[in-house]
């Protein structure tokens, strides 16, 4: 069987091609990967299933790739200068979503080239552009490809021109394939072999090993499986290895390749991609972007570009029934084994009881984590409104980091800084007006705009992250009939005039409803929450005021009218003073009740107030 040559490692680097596929959600990346797996015969026809590389249910259901995957494939080109030679291709499948940009950048670092995959019926999207620029910064060879040319709505000529303008190539150089039918895929693989450079062999055979971690997953039986790309030197089983960011040393229990199921091998040489297992049980020990080297006589310098993942968005997660709290803690621990960028700390809320304050990379990450908790661990959760990380300086010059409204310092504050992001939006040209209005309403500052083609425009804004995390994306979609695409990346911080709005029930603040908003939006938030709660909280025997306050100043108020019994029903005719006496008596009773009565907010009211359109 000629195809088995890819299973031998220590391949000569000149016969290796490492590449990844950059594409937007739904542009057919996983389908194309399926075709490539079939063509190279690494998956038997009987084992084939759609979206072969997306293993999590949630990945298949939403049609997105969350964890990077990698596969080692044999390929014998049928055309071009390498015709008939045995080439080993290593395909790294990257997440396409903006929240996972750092993971994408590490996966790109592990490749020498990238296939830019664009749907021939939709054209390029903002997040694809962001990843494309990332690939160009890493000096990768880009192969532009239009997918889904079998669709009746496809317009390959129009979009080939658009891609050619962005990448800087000729429109006829843009390859056309169909991942579904397999048309053009063999030619694409031949082009990969021809155009993508081979990895560099490193300084010498016996140079100290340096390998970059681009992903790690937790396996119940074997502990953490770390995916690496060897840059120079060799790694073999039973060696002692060292992680350069933490200095921790481990013994290499097993090393191997993924083709597409894990297979043990004798070791990995320069340019090769594979996995290693050290028996460690905690994913945080093998960090994405870290450098692996020998523990003895290892490399001095780590590879460039390692960063600690920093949470951008915070939200409180509380179990609907308090009995589930230990289960939620166990579930978060298990998720963290697989997702090192998730952070959490215990939090108590007067209104919602015990829960956790969790930090996420972005909105999609938050949604997916919540989905997985509910689906895989069968938990019912309430999540509080998302917030970001603020830097607050008080009158005494003390600096505080605040990502929870209940930690907001009281008293006068000297300066408040909020995180800002660079936003790129691609919209059809007829929606430019409404999109710009929306961005300005969300305190955006325009950075510039470019026409990608005559009917598609790229808008660039600097915006506060706090304005985006509520419902910006939904509003953008509704104003552009669903055609807009959005990408954002961190851009530091700016000073802002922010205040904390408290919601008071009968004069008592309810911590779950507090929010940090811009002073101009405080009135709007206060009105919105008081009106919403008025309709959600059941009427009591006495009148209940719902107020919104900034500090000690009340900015909005709604009253829940009291339920009252008709005390005059038994009086037929009769004297007015008799009626007045009964009414006065009722009034005094209500007043006494109001002093001692407390308002129970039903659980459903919390869920409805926190989960429906948050802005």
UniProtKB/Swiss-Prot annotation:
GO MF terms listed in the record are: GTP binding; GTPase activity; ribosome binding; translation elongation factor activity
Q: Where are the transmembrane segments?
A: none
Q: Which Gene3D superfamilies match?
A: 3.30.70.240, Elongation factor 4, C-terminal domain (3.30.70.2570), Elongation Factor G (Translational Gtpase), domain 3 (3.30.70.870), P-loop containing nucleotide triphosphate hydrolases (3.40.50.300), Translation factors (2.40.30.10)
Task: List this protein's GO terms for biological process.
Answer: positive regulation of translation
Cell location = Cell membrane
The UniProt record lists the tr-type G domain at 14-200
Give residues annotated as binding GTP: 26-31, 147-150
The job of this chain, per UniProt, is described as: Required for accurate and efficient protein synthesis under certain stress conditions. May act as a fidelity factor of the translation reaction, by catalyzing a one-codon backward translocation of tRNAs on improperly translocated ribosomes. Back-translocation proceeds from a post-translocation (POST) complex to a pre-translocation (PRE) complex, thus giving elongation factor G a second chance to translocate the tRNAs correctly. Binds to ribosomes in a GTP-dependent manner.
Q: Tell me its family.
A: Belongs to the TRAFAC class translation factor GTPase superfamily. Classic translation factor GTPase family. LepA subfamily.
- Do you know which HAMAP family this protein is assigned to? LepA
Q: What is this protein called?
A: Elongation factor 4
Species: Corynebacterium efficiens (strain DSM 44549 / YS-314 / AJ 12310 / JCM 11189 / NBRC 100395)
Gene field: lepA
């Amino acid at each position: 069987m000629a195809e088995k040559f890819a299973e031998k490692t220590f391949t000569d680097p000149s016969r290796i091609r490492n590449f990844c596929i950059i594409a937007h959600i739904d542009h057919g990346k996983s389908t194309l990967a399926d075709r490539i797996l079939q063509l190279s015969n690494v998956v038997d026809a009987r084992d084939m299933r759609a979206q072969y590389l997306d293993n999590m249910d949630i990945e298949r259901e939403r049609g997105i790739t969350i964890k990077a995957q990698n596969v080692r494939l044999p390929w014998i080109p049928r055309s071009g200068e390498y015709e008939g030679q045995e080439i080993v291709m290593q395909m790294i499948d990257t997440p396409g979503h903006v929240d996972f940009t750092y993971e994408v950048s590490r996966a790109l670092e592990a490749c020498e080239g990238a296939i830019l995959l664009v749907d021939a019926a939709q054209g390029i999207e903002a997040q694809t552009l962001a990843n494309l620029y990332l690939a160009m910064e890493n000096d990768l060879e880009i192969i532009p490809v239009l997918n889904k040319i079998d669709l009746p709505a496809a317009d390959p000529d129009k979009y080939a021109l658009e891609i050619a303008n962005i990448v800087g190539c000729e429109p006829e150089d843009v390859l056309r394939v169909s991942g579904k039918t397999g048309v053009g895929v063999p030619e694409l693989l031949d082009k990969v072999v021809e155009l993508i450079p081979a990895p560099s062999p490193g300084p010498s055979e016996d140079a100290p090993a340096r390998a970059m971690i681009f992903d790690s997953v937790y396996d119940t039986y074997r502990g953490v499986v770390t995916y690496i790309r060897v840059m120079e030197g060799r790694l073999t089983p039973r060696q002692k290895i060292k992680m350069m960011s933490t200095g921790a040393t481990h013994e290499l229990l097993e090393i191997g390749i993924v083709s597409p199921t894990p297979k043990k091998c004798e070791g990995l040489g320069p340019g090769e991609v594979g996995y290693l297992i050290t028996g460690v049980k905690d994913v945080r020990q093998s960090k994405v972007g870290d450098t692996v080297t020998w523990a003895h006589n290892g490399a001095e310098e780590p590879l460039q570009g390692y960063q600690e993942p920093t949470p951008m968005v915070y939200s409180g997660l509380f179990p609907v029934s308090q009995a589930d709290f230990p289960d939620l803690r166990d579930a978060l621990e298990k998720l963290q084994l697989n997702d090192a960028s998730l952070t959490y700390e215990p939090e108590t809320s007067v209104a919602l009881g015990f829960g956790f304050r969790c930090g996420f990379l972005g909105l999609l990450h938050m949604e997916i984590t919540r989905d997985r908790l509910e689906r895989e661990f069968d938990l019912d959760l309430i999540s509080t409104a998302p917030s970001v990380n603020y830097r607050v300086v008080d009158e005494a010059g003390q600096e505080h980091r605040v990502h929870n409204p209940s930690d907001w310092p009281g008293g006068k504050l000297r300066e408040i800084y909020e995180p800002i992001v660079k936003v790129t939006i691609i919209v059809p040209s007829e929606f430019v007006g409404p999109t710009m209005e929306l961005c300005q309403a969300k305190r955006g500052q325009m950075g510039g705009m470019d026409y990608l083609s005559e009917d598609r425009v790229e808008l660039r804004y600097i915006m506060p992250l706090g304005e985006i995390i509520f419902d910006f994306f939904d509003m953008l979609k509704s104003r552009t009939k669903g055609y807009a695409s959005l990408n954002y990346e961190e851009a530091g911080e700016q000073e802002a005039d922010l205040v904390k709005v408290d919601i008071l029930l009968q004069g008592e603040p309810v911590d779950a409803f507090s929010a940090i908003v811009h002073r101009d939006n405080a009135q709007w938030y206060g009105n919105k929450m008081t009106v919403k709660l008025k309709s959600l909280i059941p009427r009591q025997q006495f009148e209940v005021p719902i107020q919104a306050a900034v500090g000690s100043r009340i900015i909005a108020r709604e009253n829940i009218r009291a339920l009252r019994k008709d005390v005059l029903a038994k009086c037929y005719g009769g004297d007015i003073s008799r009626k007045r006496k009964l009414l006065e008596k009722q009034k005094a009773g209500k007043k006494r009740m109001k002093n001692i009565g407390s308002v129970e907010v039903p659980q459903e009211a919390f869920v409805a107030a926190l989960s429906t359109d948050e802005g």
